[in-house]
Amino acid sequence: MKFIVKLFPEIMMKSKPVRMRFTKMLETNIRNVLKKVDETAKVKREWDKIMVLVPDDRQDLVEAFAERLACIPGIAHVLQVSESTFESVDDIYQQTLAVYKDELAGKTFCVRVKRVGNHDFRSIEVERYVGGGLNQFTEAAGVRLKNPDMTINLEIDKESLYLVSKRIEGLGGYPMATQEDVLSLISGGFDSGVSSYQFIKRGSRTHYCFFNLGGDQHEIGVKQVAYHLWQKYGESHKVKFISIPFDPVVTEILEKIDNGQMGVILKRMMMRAAAKVARKMGIQALVTGEAMGQVSSQTLTNLSIIDRCTDQLILRPLIAMDKQDIINLSRKIGTEDLSKSIPEYCGVISQRPTVKAVLSKIEAEELKFSEDLIDRVIEAAEVIDIREIATSMDTKITSTETVGDINSGEVIIDVRAPEEEEQSPLEVEGVEVKAIPFFRLATKFADLDKSKTYLLYCDRGVMSKLQALYLQEQGYDNVKVYRP
């Protein structure tokens, strides 16, 4: 069994050297991701596609490979195929009949053929021959070229025949690291998660800069969002997570700044700090989740004034998107439930925000700040490899017990994503196991029996630890981490 990975159309339009570079990078990215599933994963690059081979004795890898290929930037779609050779058009028909005869019963169908190489027949001739044979010698309801119940896809590549059993839509976009790095200002809300995803999809290694205004509980929630985005869509490359303690800045704003100017000035201070961090990391652009008119600081006048605080390029991929469209996309990429549980801190500091700030007034207010304020908070920033999030939390989860044995009455909560849980469900004899995905646990945990102790489980022990800390900060002491 094989997967045929089809390149995103914009890659196909590039010049030969650029297309080759992008395809090589995509091959490397696929290999990096799949080798985390199975070390023996075989990936082969061709001019117009990439082949992923699944050994006949490892069919257990099919679903895992398919799931990960669907989330790698640069892929238009993936075809799950079985490969064989053929001698004639009739041989192609006979092989197709053997595979699809039973499945066609009572259904309308059409046959679609794509062909590469020199043959003594055309693609349409194969479609007619195979379609006519299937219509005559199966119990199909007939041929229907538009909107059939079933489409039989065949790919012919020189002497090879590929019978397509499944088509999996890809993420699109460009392969990771074919574009320059960006630093995304992430708050954990709907907007910043979606804007980060947009640049991952577009091929940029997306690092995360978080301004902590709400303590450890806020930080752990944001780390969950960032880790989820990286693990699902950008796992092929290392990125950094930077946490900047911004409460000293907020304190000075509340004590010294005119109330109406607070929102714009807070954003300008964030941009200044992020720009300094980006320059240290050799990153040219910042990414934010701002959308025009969504809040008072996001009018065109205010955005223009915010931009003037730095010469760093500031990118806003959501600038013209409606809020509901942003929420819908966050649901699609798996961050909606995580973002729902994270409060928005920026909006609470100004009661009468200006929607049309004046630059001279803003600059006059900013003279009230301590001169070294930004440098001090950057100096106190925590910079970690996003893969080390679990390790970094070990020092904070001092009261969370990690257990390998289960006591009577304890309940296991499997916090893995639904597709992972379905692929390899956790079963422990004599123990109740509840499947609650990590992104729903924050809202579902309050409904559980408070008299019981819950053991959180995931494959790597990362999300279970993050969720344990999060729940403990909310006041729950009946939670542990389960590592069998």
From Swiss-Prot:
Q: Please give the GO cellular component terms listed in this UniProt entry.
A: cytosol
Record-level GO BP terms? thiamine biosynthetic process; thiamine diphosphate biosynthetic process; thiazole biosynthetic process; tRNA 4-thiouridine biosynthesis
UniProt: ATP binding residues: L185, I186, K267, G289, Q298
Tell me which EC number(s) this protein carries.
2.8.1.4
Q: Where in the cell is it found?
A: Cytoplasm
Respond yes or no to whether keyword Transferase is given for this record.
yes
Active-site residue list:
C458 (cysteine persulfide intermediate)
The record, for Gene3D superfamilies, names: 3.30.2130.30, HUPs, Rhodanese-like domain
Q: In which pathway does it act?
A: Cofactor biosynthesis; thiamine diphosphate biosynthesis
Which keywords does this chain's UniProt record carry?
ATP-binding, Cytoplasm, Disulfide bond, Nucleotide-binding, Redox-active center, RNA-binding, Thiamine biosynthesis, Transferase, tRNA-binding
Function description: Catalyzes the ATP-dependent transfer of a sulfur to tRNA to produce 4-thiouridine in position 8 of tRNAs, which functions as a near-UV photosensor. Also catalyzes the transfer of sulfur to the sulfur carrier protein ThiS, forming ThiS-thiocarboxylate. This is a step in the synthesis of thiazole, in the thiamine biosynthesis pathway. The sulfur is donated as persulfide by IscS.
Q: What is this protein called?
A: tRNA sulfurtransferase
Q: Which organism is it from?
A: Shewanella woodyi (strain ATCC 51908 / MS32)
